[in-house]
Amino acid sequence: MAPVLENRRARHDYEILETYEAGIALKGTEVKSLRAGKVDFTGSFARFEDGELYLENLYIAPYEKGSYANVDPRRKRKLLLHKHELRRLLGKVEQKGLTLVPLKIYFNERGYAKVLLGLARGKKAYEKRREDKKEAVRRALEEL
């Protein structure tokens, strides 16, 4: 279960409350680009639309040998979850200030692409600064 790509920025910008594993519906050339690690999480998020969950603004680079089979790199991609998980998530996301952000994309042991979603609350700037200071102190103590 080695991660293809991890969204480290999300853990800095958001407080992660819960995590969920979801399948992701991809086209063939997207899988090839994903295996090559050509993914950018910047600005990506998950959103409900007509009772289904979609991952939006995730950039998967076009496969260089893909020709006409390549699709829009920032297209909406459907996330695959059980109905009871979708209902539970919908209730939580409707709360003010909570959002779903992708934390990690990887391939499971069966070779299927999975995305680890985090139910998150945005951090304020002063919270980020406080956390950065704590991390700097921890590193300084480790060096000694």
Curated annotation (Swiss-Prot):
Q: Which compartments is it annotated to reside in?
A: Cytoplasm
Q: Name one GO molecular function term.
A: rRNA binding
Name the PROSITE patterns for this protein: SSRP (PS01317)
| Keywords annotated in UniProt | Cytoplasm, RNA-binding, rRNA-binding
The protein's superkingdom reads Bacteria
InterPro entries per the UniProt record, alphabetical = SmpB, SsrA-bd_prot, SsrA-bd_prot_CS
Per the UniProt entry, what is one GO biological process?
Answer: trans-translation
Q: Which residues form the signal peptide?
A: none
Q: Which GO terms describe its cellular component?
A: cytosol
Q: What does this protein do?
A: Required for rescue of stalled ribosomes mediated by trans-translation. Binds to tmRNA (also known as SsrA and 10Sa), required for stable association of tmRNA with ribosomes, probably by bridging tmRNA to 50S subunit. tmRNA and SmpB together mimic tRNA shape, replacing the anticodon stem-loop with SmpB. tmRNA is encoded by the ssrA gene; the 2 termini fold to resemble tRNA(Ala) and it encodes a 'tag peptide', a short internal open reading frame. During trans-translation Ala-aminoacylated tmRNA acts like a tRNA, entering the A-site of stalled ribosomes, displacing the stalled mRNA.
Supply the HAMAP family for this chain.
SmpB
The similarity annotation says: Belongs to the SmpB family.
The entry's other comment says: Athough the Valle et al., electron microscopy paper indicates this protein came from T.thermophilus, its sequence maps to A.aeolicus. The Fu et al., paper maps the coordinates of T.thermophilus to E.coli.
Listed under subunit, the entry gives: Binds tmRNA. Binds to both the 50S and 30S ribosomal subunits via rRNA contacts, bridges tmRNA binding to stalled ribosomes.
- Its protein name is SsrA-binding protein
